[in-house]
A protein has these predicted regions:
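Catalytic cores of nucleotide-sugar-dependent glycosyltransferases that transfer UDP/GDP/TDP-activated
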Residues: 1-515
Length: 515
């Protein structure tokens, strides 16, 4: 069996790490490793991938092909037929035939390369077995990506184009939510696979006291008080304002550490504003603790008393697994539609909240209503869709401001900033918010034995349900099934209505900072 993984780039990041873990997991569990060969195709950008491979344990030989037409494209200059030709030629150079090769493609429909969906459809029509793994959706608050794919098509035509259907074209998803979405959109259950990410063992962490001293020496983080590490690249949907809110609510009890700045220029302005605000308000928040000029992530985790997450959306939600493997309790924002699978496996998230309630009156109802309506209109318009009707906007306002409270994550950055300034200027506001959200103080005050029991429980579940061996077994079953399917060269689509777009743009899924 030959397995060829395909992604736009091999830079450090989530999907690249997933691919590396999948290769390791499959090599670990495949019953006939002598007859298992790996290929890897990307657009050519690969920050130290080969060095990572050489340093990695349990990594087999991988043939690497570079296809420049596979890179991110800002304009639709590449024709699908050209990219299909490149892919076909590279597979032939690997010596991989159509009959015993699975092409495992990550995020083909995300809108990073407008030619890729059409190229894959051509290969599918020629009988190549395809596993299309979806981590993220262009339909989910990514209008620029979606419109790049849309071009001159209408929405129904694009839906047909993006999600090809045939007996030898299967889909893999990270969670039950996405499984349900694709099934409801028309993907047959026998071509749809639940494929959560594998969670490798975390290397042994340094001594906590030594790591705290290093943080103090390098970044001025005091050794006193609790240290909450937020190991994240601070893009907009990571909801950095809420991390600052933790610091504002407990200014003398804790410090918050953010590891990485965004690399996307569009996110930098928000990030720099949060840095300026933290300095102005003298909040105990420390930035860029990781990366090239910072500390290794293991040292930041070692220094932490808790791991924090405030993200408003995730694909798989690796953050909900990693903290327990690092033997640290996770606090902050729960994402129930993501963590539902983890809870079903036996995990508990006792010190997390689904909402962080804020009195609407702190910023004014008129400002909140105007912000929600305008932000939702802008999102809908960005997808080239008509203005939402007034009753939809009214329902959005009523649902988000029930009992004159609003979730902090439903505010945009300017309104979040107003809340932070009010807390610092008027200490009674701090107590009002803490009274509405008792989970925050409870998460910090939980006794050691309780935290250790929770860590032990969740760590066992992660090791049992999300280990590389389990992931490898899943991959084996999926690939074996794909290779035994009849090669139906009649490739169809899912129908004229983009049900995924309809789902993701419903008001109850809207967040101002998801983009």
């Amino acid at each position: 069996m030959n397995v060829v993984y395909l992604h736009y780039h091999l830079n450090h990041g989530g999907v690249t790490r997933v691919i590396a873990n999948q290769i390791r997991a499959l090599a670990l569990t495949y019953t006939d490793p002598a007859h298992l060969r790996f290929g890897l195709l990307s657009g050519g950008s690969a920050d130290n991938w080969k060095e990572d491979l050489r340093a990695s344990r349990q990594m087999p030989e991988v043939l690497i092909g570079v296809l420049p037409r596979l890179q991110y494209d800002s304009q639709s200059g590449v024709e699908p037929v050209e990219l299909a030709t490149d892919l076909r030629r590279q597979l032939a150079e690997f010596g991989f035939g159509r009959e015993d090769t699975v092409l495992h493609v990550h995020n083909h429909s995300l809108g990073k390369n407008a030619a890729l969906p059409g190229a894959l459809r051509r290969l599918g029509a020629e009988g190549f077995a395809l596993l299309l793994q979806l981590h993220d959706f262009a339909e989910d608050h990514r209008p620029a990506n979606y419109c790049h794919l849309l071009g001159s098509r209408d929405h129904g035509d694009l839906f047909e184009h993006l999600y090809p259907q045939a007996s030898h074209i299967h889909y893999a998803v990270l969670n039950s939510r996405d499984y349900s979405l694709l099934w409801q959109a028309g993907v047959p259950a026998d071509r749809l696979h639940y494929l959560p990410n594998a969670m490798p063992e975390v290397p042994h962490l340094p001594d906590q006291a030594a790591a705290r001293r290093t943080l103090q020496d390098r970044f001025g983080v005091p050794c006193s008080g609790l240290f909450l590490a937020y190991p994240v690249r601070a893009i907009r949907r990571k909801n950095l304002g809420e991390a600052l809110l933790w610091a504002a609510l407990f200014p003398s009890d804790l410090q918050v550490g953010i590891t990485l700045p965004p690399t996307n220029p569009a996110a930098l302005s928000h990030y720099e504003r949060w840095k300026q605000l933290a300095a102005q308000l003298r909040l105990p928040v420390y930035f860029e603790l990781g990366g090239a000029n910072g500390l290794p992530v293991a040292e930041v985790l070692a220094a932490a008393d808790r791991i924090l997450t405030t993200s408003v959306t995730e694909g798989f939600g690796m953050a909900f697994l990693e903290s327990w493997m690092a033997e640290r309790v996770l606090v902050g924002r729960n994402l129930p539609e993501i963590t539902a699978d983890f809870v079903a496996a036996g995990m508990r998230f006792d010190h997390m909240y689904d909402q962080l309630r804020i009195p609407v009156g702190l910023v004014g109802r008129a400002a909140v209503e105007e912000m929600l309506c305008e932000a939702y209109r802008q999102l809908v318009h960005a997808y080239h869709l008509p203005d939402p009707p007034p009753n939809v906007l009214s329902e959005l306002i009523d649902e988000r401001t029930h009992n004159d409270l609003i979730d902090f994550a439903d505010l945009n950055e300017p309104l979040q900033e107003q809340i932070l300034r009010r807390i610092v200027a008027h200490p009674p506001v701090r107590q009002e918010i803490l009274a509405l959200n008792p989970t925050l103080a409870q998460a910090l005050a939980a006794p050691d034995f309780e935290r250790q029991n929770l860590i032990h429980l969740n760590r066992q579940v992660v090791q049992r349900s999300y280990c590389p061996a389990v992931s490898g077994a899943r991959l084996c079953r999926i690939y074996d099934k794909l290779l035994t399917q009849p090669r139906d060269v009649s490739v169809t689509g899912l129908g004229p209505e983009n049900r995924l777009l309809t789902h993701f743009l419903t008001p109850n899924r809207f967040r101002p900072m998801k983009g």
